[in-house]
Amino acid sequence: MASDQPTYDEVYVISDIHLGGQGDFQIFKDSQRLAWFIKHIAHLSAERKIALVLNGDIVDFLADQDAKCFDPMRAVAKLEAVFDNLALQDVWIALRDFVRTKKRTLILVLGNHDIELALPAVTHHLLWELCSDDESARGRIMLIFDNSGFSCSVARAQVLCVHGNEVDKYNIIDYEALRHVIVAINRGLD
């Protein structure tokens, strides 16, 4: 692995949170416990470099009755609904505080239920919700939206975090097609 990869004293990895959805489609049910955990690691020793990896399926864009496998037209509205969901407020507050804490890094890895996070408007909205205009907080977030995974060193160990859908033939993301969609959006093409 590359020698220029980040090094941390501690790395915590959580996968498949699936924030969002209404009624029976809402998978995540323990906002207070997750918020407590995020706050706990944010307030560990201020001298230690700590990373929190949300390892895919952070937001569940598929958790509603009318879900499409990829819905760029409604993605920002769906993300807004997740941020506005009162049942999830504790988690968002804890994540906002986490990225405002020195020596803390939040790493977001794309999964197969939150592909829309890679779309420019959705990424912008997500970062605005987490950081507002706090550039220091923004500098503590890493986005891994290209299927490369997140690699780092923890003490002498090498760590690689991938969501895992890339080895599941039923849930593979076509990253080249996603890149073409993003290019078209950035260039104002239909």
Residue ranges and their predicted role:
Residues 1-190:
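Extended recognition/assembly regions associated with phosphoester-bond processing machinery
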